[in-house]
Curated annotation (Swiss-Prot):
Its main location: cytoplasm. This is Ribonuclease 3. The gene is rnc. Keywords: Cytoplasm, Endonuclease, Hydrolase, Magnesium, Metal-binding, mRNA processing, Nuclease, RNA-binding, rRNA processing, rRNA-binding, tRNA processing. The active site is at residues 54, 126. It comes from Sinorhizobium fredii (strain NBRC 101917 / NGR234). Residues 12-137 form the RNase III domain.
Amino acid sequence: MMKGRSLSAEDRARLETAIGYQFAEKERLDRALTHSSARNARASNYQRLEFLGDRVLGLCVAELLFQTFLDANEGELSVRLNQLVSAESCARVADELSLHEYIRTGSDVKKITGKHMMNVRADVVESLIAAIYLDGGLEAARRFVLRHWTDRAASADGARRDAKTELQEWAHAKFGAAPRYRTDDRSGPDHDPRFTVTVEVDGIAPETGTDRSKRGAEQIAAMRLLEREGVWQKRSAGN
């Protein structure tokens, strides 16, 4: 992270090469990488871009899934979509692009740790998608999304059924009890909330999940429990 300072021309050029897009208006890229903690960032941080980028990403991935999985029903497509646009998935894209090296932050950067740091990385990816969309249009944004999500969408992990349904059936068969979900935390602005949910099954340790929706967090918690117990094969780091 770059505390307080803006992107240099060299930094900007290197990042544009990494993301595969050259900005006509360079300030769009700067804003996409400016955390709200940065000095004088009140009117120029990435939060508004993040709001738009979330929608552009969802549209592009939904279109990709619709065109790829012709026999999938709405429920399966929704499960795939939730997995692919989750904070964890977006944060992995940020890591692949080393975006953390370019985020402009303020003096309280040390407070950004753990899950919040994952959310920051995910938010920056969404704001970057919005910046590309505003600068070059939907097709430019779609090319970026397809470059980083096509392989993820095609992975075997995407074919899994609904994690909550799977956990419900497994828990009943193994323990004779239903899973219980508890919302532990809700954070973030109204337009981009983060929910942390714990799932408990009698007889085994609980698991937690964090996502932009309560249902998404429940799905992630259920998925983690299924993976931990060996019911599902754990996802590879690239998916």
